[in-house]
């Protein structure tokens, strides 16, 4: 299944065409860009422990490891965006054939957030004398929660660049019928106006220092939702644009201690204030996606000190996530009638299956004996047929119970740095229990 979806998402000929269409200074001689993407995808999926190991296992690699690393550290960010957005477009027809639900029928949802890459090892000569952490950059990601796919990505090499500026290229591709949601960092006039100018709608949380308001209407009560009460008003900003502001008064404070939240939106009146307040809660789904990227896939390769190489590693992990997401949907649809309502497959357990079975498949069934599907309909039907062979229990998601809130207290540095022997603590606890 993984091989089928990978070929659909990043067919070698298509990847090389993307390289030719979007490259600026790079060129292909003996090492094709499709080969680089294939190697990085194997590492991101965990099918190879490292790029070095993946390169040594690849038959027919005609360049040295030094040439491979040199190619990777020169990968242009424009190529990464074209790769992610293009591969998502290739997967969307298959996802739609498999079937999916809609959070807000009639609208395409886009959740935007930034992901800063962690500090890398200081292997580069220029970094060795630096005491502080070396940050290789970040990416602003557009995520579709209905499809569970990352549909666009804007990589940025400068870790200190503004996310508010970096999101503008993503908004340039927005269109009517789309609803973009973002946190309070993006509540600025340039961002909101850029979104509205494309015909798209937005829901953005209001920060403490928001754009200046020229006029505010009276508040109108709008009823209640599960988490609290809602009211709204019309606001006008300095550019003369009039938007809706929705206030949500929470029954209990959230994790940040907030009891009141405000949202700005330009959605039409057909979407109620209660819906706007409820829709914003969906924004947290992108946090879950980032968490799965970090825990299931190799999205943070700290040995890649070069910003371009680190961003390629993250983009490869995003690509791998989209592949696993299609596999997850295939398994859920294949077993939907036999499993209880709300049953979900786990991306983590699917990744474990992929890692354990992929190598054996490569040996038992070489590529020349593995026919690939040419249409999304054919691919969806074949994925469902293969998914029915998977035991649902082996890939079922294990939901965790709610965490018990613990009060945060001030702690002395000496106590924070203290340590104990786990074996001795357990032994003492057992003795106390028996006493």
Where is each model-derived feature located?
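Single, function-defining residue in the core of a domain
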Residues: 1-47, 51-54, 62-75, 83, ...
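Short, basic-rich loop-to-helix N-cap that marks the start of a DNA-contacting helix
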Residues: 79
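A short, well-structured juxtamembrane/interface segment
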Residues: 91-100
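Extracellular beta-strand-rich solenoid/capping regions of secreted or surface-exposed proteins
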Residues: 129-130
């Amino acid at each position: 299944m993984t091989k089928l979806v990978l070929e659909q998402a990043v067919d070698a000929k298509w990847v090389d065409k993307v390289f030719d269409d979007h490259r600026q200074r790079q060129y292909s001689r003996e090492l094709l860009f499709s080969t680089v993407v294939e190697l990085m995808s194997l590492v991101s999926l965990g099918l190879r422990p490292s790029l070095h190991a993946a390169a040594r296992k690849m038959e027919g690699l005609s360049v040295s490891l030094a040439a491979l690393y040199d190619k990777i550290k020169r990968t242009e960010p424009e190529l990464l965006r074209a790769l992610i957005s293009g591969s998502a477009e290739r997967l969307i027809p298959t996802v739609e054939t498999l079937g999916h639900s809609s959070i807000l029928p009639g609208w395409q949802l886009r959740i935007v957030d930034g992901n800063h890459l962690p500090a890398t090892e200081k292997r580069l000569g220029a970094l060795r004398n630096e005491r502080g952490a070396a940050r290789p950059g970040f990416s602003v990601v557009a995520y579709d929660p209905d499809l569970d796919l990352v549909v666009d990505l804007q990589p940025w090499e400068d870790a200190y660049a503004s996310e508010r500026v970096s999101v503008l290229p993503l908004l340039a591709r927005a269109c009517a019928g789309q609803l973009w949601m973002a946190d309070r960092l993006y509540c600025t006039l340039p961002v909101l106006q850029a979104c509205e100018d494309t015909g798209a709608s937005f829901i953005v949380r209001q920060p403490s220092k928001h754009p200046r308001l020229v006029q505010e209407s009276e508040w109108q009560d709008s009823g209640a939702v599960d988490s609290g009460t809602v009211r709204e008003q019309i606001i006008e900003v300095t550019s003369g644009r009039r938007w809706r502001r929705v206030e949500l008064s929470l029954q209990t404070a959230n994790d940040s201690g907030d009891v009141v939240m405000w949202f700005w939106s330009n959605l039409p009146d057909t979407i109620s204030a209660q819906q706007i307040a409820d829709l914003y809660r969906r924004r947290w789904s992108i946090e879950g996606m980032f968490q799965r990227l970090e825990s299931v896939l190799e999205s943070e390769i700290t040995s890649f000190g070069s910003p371009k190489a680190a961003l390629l590693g993250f983009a490869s992990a995003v690509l791998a996530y989209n592949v696993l997401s299609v596999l997850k949907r295939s398994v859920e649809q294949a077993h939907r009638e036999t499993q209880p309502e709300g049953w979900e497959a786990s991306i983590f357990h699917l990744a474990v299956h992929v890692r354990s079975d992929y190598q054996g498949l490569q040996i038992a069934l070489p590529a020349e004996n593995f026919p690939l599907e040419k249409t999304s309909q054919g691919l969806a039907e074949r994925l469902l047929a293969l998914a029915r062979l998977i035991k649902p229990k082996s890939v079922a998601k294990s939901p965790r119970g709610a965490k018990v809130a613990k009060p945060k207290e001030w702690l002395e540095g000496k106590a924070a740095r203290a340590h104990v022997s786990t074996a001795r603590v357990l032994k003492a606890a057992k003795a106390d229990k028996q006493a």
